[in-house]
Amino acid sequence: MTQAKVRLLSFDDYLAYDDGLDKNYELINGELLEVPPETEENAYRAFSLLLALSEFVDIRRIKVQKLEIEVFAFPGMPLNRQPDLTVLAEGHIEQMADINQMAIKRFMDPPLMVVEVVSPYSSQSEANYRRDYIDKRQQFEQRKVPEYWIVDPTAQQVSVLVLVNGAYQASVFEGSQIIQSAVFPELSVTANVVLSA
């Protein structure tokens, strides 16, 4: 018996969809594409950053995985993203309660910050690299997310992209360098701490 492909026309359709399997999906051109679960190492890196950030922002506003962000769908790219870590803006918790979803829709303000941990890759042409460095950068920039961190264990660096006049400006931090955050200037964490797992 063959199973029909599920067609979802909108982000709202996607949020309402439940196949009971607790899997992660991306919505591309109306079709669901299953994405693999995050590795334990990536989750650990996100949680360690959550602990550092919790000194400066209410921990309820820091979400590790499972939060959906509606983004602009460029050709061949998904309509949704599930960052490894998201820092919500003021009002997001109330707005998400109003829609009864762990989601930031396009009519809402963007999150203050998103963080992606890059899965291992051997060349910059591989999907893991392109997804975080190119595709998500383009979508988060278009969504006007003020700060986007790319935590890259393969390259042993943390890139901090800050939105300046509608475009991201990148700074790269390695080793014992203290990461400079525009959103959280008082944050004092080194690249080594964020990269360790």
Explain the meaning of each model-derived region.
Residues 1-197:
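Gly/Pro/Ser/Thr-rich low-complexity, intrinsically disordered segments predominantly at protein N-termini
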